[in-house]
Amino acid sequence: MKTNVIIDGDACPVVNSVIELTKGTGIFVTILRSFSHFSQQIQPEHVKIVYVDDGPDAVDYKIVELASNNDIVITQDYGLASLLIDKVHTVMHHKGNIYHSNNIQSLLNQRYLNAQIRRRGGRHKGPPPFTTEDRLKFEHAFRKIINQI
């Protein structure tokens, strides 16, 4: 069974890393984006871009539809990750963290608490900027996963 890397691609900073690391491996890459992120950039043969309608969660629904048990999904969306943990081989964050059934609930709880703070007009600290160190951590974790497949 072939392996696909499915990327929640509208704001993913590791797309180019994934494309490079999968070259010549037999692993295919599917990048999902909304039409508002349309690009005519030519991709390598092992890369396919799927565009979906703009709208809340449209990309997420398409990822759930396309994903299968041998796939690797890259997303920063905890809700999407929770739907995929038991469906695919691996779900990972673009900073290299792997989502598991033992860590997803605390991430969802934190997301809920942050949403409550925002609804009350409050503010909370957002994520720090993506760094070179984050990219290297992701690439190391991603290499480990694709070497296991």
From Swiss-Prot:
Signal peptide: none annotated. It holds the Pfam family DUF188. PANTHER family: UPF0178 PROTEIN YAII. Belongs to the UPF0178 family. This is UPF0178 protein SERP0336. It comes from Staphylococcus epidermidis (strain ATCC 35984 / DSM 28319 / BCRC 17069 / CCUG 31568 / BM 3577 / RP62A).
